[in-house]
Amino acid sequence: MNERIALYEGKAKIVYASESPDELVLHFKDDTSAFDGEKVEQLAHKGEINNAFNAFIMEYLQGEGVPTHFIRRLNARESLVRRLEMIPVECVVRNRAAGSLSKRLGIEEGRVLEPPTLEFFLKNDALHDPMINTSHIRTFGWATAEEVEAMRRWTMRVNMLLSALFAKANLILVDFKLEFGRFDGELYLGDEFSPDGCRLWDALSLEKMDKDRFRRGLGGVVEAYAEVARRLGVPLPAAS
């Protein structure tokens, strides 16, 4: 295509139509935001790192039997994915207390959560992504009972797989969010998995290696993302 059609632009990605009606192109931006868009910066090469990181994780999960929308990486900043009918729910797994959970429940940051917690949030920027429960999801028609159970099952499976993967790289997977969608009547993992959407700590120092570095003004965001990628063996573009 000579001129692409942008279907949606979010905080960190642009979604383009592709030559196939069943496929989309994800373009990873350098934009970084926090606090519902109140804090926004451009961090050079972040989009390239996240694209490579996401491709690595999605391919790993597919190899372990997790159905994802990922098809292939197209270039340094873009990937081709299946066009899903997205379910407007974020599935958040927490292995340690941090972020909003610590604030909401007064739990000390870093406390190990056993078993891990699973929370659901409605994807709605205007409402600031409120927490919801499975009853809300079914009552308001966001997903069926069967889909909710499948999202729960796949999310906990991903947690087991990625916690082990990151542990081998001397990293703690503190928490993360997943989104799912439908394609031909089947449920697939959608969106992305990158340090933008999870918390990762160094296993020894507990240094934050994720977007919290941006939220808290710690600096070195791109460097931390690149270090996480390096430990996992993610091949990065030369400029990164």
Curated annotation (Swiss-Prot):
Gene3D superfamilies: ATP-grasp fold, B domain (3.30.470.20), Phosphorylase Kinase, domain 1 (3.30.200.20). One of its GO terms (molecular function) is phosphoribosylaminoimidazolesuccinocarboxamide synthase activity. InterPro entries: SAICAR_synt/ADE2_N, SAICAR_synt_PurC, SAICAR_synth, SAICAR_synthetase, SAICAR_synthetase_CS. The keyword Nucleotide-binding applies. Its EC number is 6.3.2.6. Belongs to the SAICAR synthetase family. One of its GO terms (biological process) is 'de novo' IMP biosynthetic process. This is Phosphoribosylaminoimidazole-succinocarboxamide synthase. Keywords: ATP-binding, Ligase, Nucleotide-binding, Purine biosynthesis. It catalyses: 5-amino-1-(5-phospho-D-ribosyl)imidazole-4-carboxylate + L-aspartate + ATP = (2S)-2-[5-amino-1-(5-phospho-beta-D-ribosyl)imidazole-4-carboxamido]succinate + ADP + phosphate + 2 H(+). GO terms for cellular component: cytosol. It comes from Acidithiobacillus ferrooxidans (strain ATCC 23270 / DSM 14882 / CIP 104768 / NCIMB 8455). The lineage of its organism: Bacteria, Pseudomonadati, Pseudomonadota, Acidithiobacillia, Acidithiobacillales. Pathway: Purine metabolism; IMP biosynthesis via de novo pathway; 5-amino-1-(5-phospho-D-ribosyl)imidazole-4-carboxamide from 5-amino-1-(5-phospho-D-ribosyl)imidazole-4-carboxylate: step 1/2.
